[in-house]
Amino acid sequence: MAEKTAGPRPIILGIVGDSAAGKTTITRGLVRLLGEEHVTHVAADDYHRFDRKQRAELQITPLHPGCNYIDIMEQDFHHLREGRAILKPVYQHADGTFGAPVYVRPQQFTVIEGLLGYHTETLRECFDVRVFLAPPEDLRRGWKIQRDCSRRAYSTD
């Protein structure tokens, strides 16, 4: 069984929205506001089932539930809500591959950001606060192109 953190149950905040909706920007602001020493940050993108190359071959995007380990997300998010540490997978956006898993302990606040954080009732029940970001599509698309080309090794093609 996962080790439980001492103290009261952490407050779990969810920041969900489409790709490039501003989830990471909002999350970084929350971490600065609440204090890094009080916040655990979890990216739901780490629960992708396939790396970037495999997704291209399968012609599937991370927005498809089958492209993600939803069952493991449910289990891990539930453990975090209970104040228990998890061994979390790591997806590396810079090159679209997976890194070694990391041990994560929940702090006073745990902020979880990603595409499918509210996909199931079980996931939704893990959050104390749920935020869904939906910027205008033309703005979001521009942000996505800029981000993917500058930080994720994509081309404008």
Tell me what each language-model feature is.
Residues E3-P10:
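Phosphate-binding P-loop
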Residues D18:
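P-loop (Walker A) phosphate-binding loop of NTP-binding proteins
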Residues K23:
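Conserved lysine of the Walker
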Residues I26, L30:
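Hydrophobic positions on the alpha1 helix immediately C-terminal to the Walker A/P-loop
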Residues E37-A43, R49-G96, F109:
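Conserved nucleotide-sensing/catalytic segment adjacent to the nucleotide-binding pocket
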Residues G99-S150:
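ATP-dependent NMP and nucleoside kinases share a basic, alpha-helical "lid"
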Residues R151-D157:
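Small-molecule kinase domains that catalyze NTP-dependent phosphoryl transfer to phosphate-bearing small molecules
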